[in-house]
Amino acid sequence: MNKVIVTGAQWGDEGKGRIVDLLAEAADCVVRFNGGHNAGHTLVVGGKTWKLALLPCGLLRGKLGVIGNGVVVDPQALLAEIDRIAAEGLAITPDTLAIADNATLLLPSHIALDAAQEAARAQAIGTTGRGIGPAFEDRAGRRAIRLADLADPAVLRERLAEALRYHNAVLAALGRPACELEPMLAALLEQARRILPYLRPAWKLLSEADEAGRRILFEGAQAMLLDVEHGTYPFVTSSGTGPAQAASGSGLGSAARGHALGVCKAYATRVGGGPFPTELDDAVGARLREKGGEYGTNTGRPRRCGWLDAALLRQSVRVGGMSSLALTKLDVLDGLDELRICTGYRVDGVLRDDYPAGLAERGRVAPVYETLPGWQESTRGARSLDALPEAARAYVRRIAELAGAPVSLISTGAERDDVIRLADPWMPASGG
């Protein structure tokens, strides 16, 4: 197995960066294939804390980083991140980072549109306000500017003028000021000098690496329940977030044959608006938030917390074709007398094991819980299954049963090696 795809199995913030960092040790290159700079990772490497948004985590381990065509790239944010990481001691160069030349450019006008559209909604989605959605809208509407277009000032001017005609019409309709072409063009041309050396046909680079048997790790952003088609729509991101997106978002079709590793917390969290059937607005929810440090890496927003929803997790596993699960933050549950897992829902008195797609039905959902005993012992830092209390082992087993996927990794603390390895995602499944 030379390809592993790491994606979130809940609503994001599951600790994917930590798992990617763990697996990157055995990888040759690490690929970002979706999203933008709206999702961040906090990693501790060699006792030092790093915060990344656009850059692949594998760069911190000396691996080749690739930003694929499925990512929308804000050049200002990218260069600021490169400079910040360099100031912290890690130089990012065209030898260590490749960016797909056909990736979409995120513009200041996308950020203006994001703010205007969010303010105009009757019910806010809770976007990060970084322009991700409008950039993906432009890509679908064939107005997008690709990074390769930065190389030709005349083409860039023409494409930018076309995009701004549309953007400014929408901004005017929403009562917002227009964005000016000349200042934006000047800034892009200045940024182009630094960005162009990183551009490559990423699909070709990855195809050659795959043919040579190199190990390729795909680093997903957001999560399955934020997928634009299969998530809790419309409270979702604007792109595909599942393992299948790794193929189209990188240009490496064979990514679809890799090991799909879904990352999920031992409980559930969500940032911003949208359905959350198992949300806890009580002392237990507050405890999970504080003990789990549930605040956004990029935004600092407090996360909503609740019990694990195994019904939605099972949906993520099935829709995403997930091969196994990495369970994180098990130690946050230490000290609770009992735990609850949502196994399905009642809608108008009818029991069902799938979450409704219709907005009206969602408003009538009541979660159905299974109660399990908690544990008082500490699981923090446990590095073997035998080191866990029996109740914790039973909880992990039940999650795997309900989700329909084996648990291959369990994270039990903040240190990089606080992990129980039950199976190696890089190795072929037994019998396969």
Curated annotation (Swiss-Prot):
MF terms (GO), sorted A to Z: adenylosuccinate synthase activity; GTP binding; magnesium ion binding
Source domain of life: Bacteria
> One Pfam annotation, family name?
Adenylsucc_synt
Record keyword Iron-sulfur present: no
Q: Matching SUPFAM superfamilies, A to Z?
A: P-loop containing nucleoside triphosphate hydrolases
- Looking at the UniProt entry, the stretches that span the membrane are none
Cofactor binding mode and count: Binds 1 Mg(2+) ion per subunit.
Annotated metabolic or biological route of this protein:
Purine metabolism; AMP biosynthesis via de novo pathway; AMP from IMP: step 1/2
- List GO terms (cellular component aspect): cytoplasm
Q: Which residues bind Mg(2+)?
A: D13, G40
EC annotation from Swiss-Prot or TrEMBL: 6.3.4.4
Binding sites annotated in the UniProt record for GTP: 12-18, 40-42, 303, 329-331, 411-413
Catalytic activity annotation: IMP + L-aspartate + GTP = N(6)-(1,2-dicarboxyethyl)-AMP + GDP + phosphate + 2 H(+)
- Residues binding substrate are T297, N298, T299, G300, R301, P302, R303
| Signal peptide span | none
Q: Which family does it belong to?
A: Belongs to the adenylosuccinate synthetase family.
Q: What does this protein do?
A: Plays an important role in the de novo pathway of purine nucleotide biosynthesis. Catalyzes the first committed step in the biosynthesis of AMP from IMP.
What's the protein name?
A: Adenylosuccinate synthetase 1
Q: Which organism is it from?
A: Chromobacterium violaceum (strain ATCC 12472 / DSM 30191 / JCM 1249 / CCUG 213 / NBRC 12614 / NCIMB 9131 / NCTC 9757 / MK)
Designated gene of the protein:
purA1
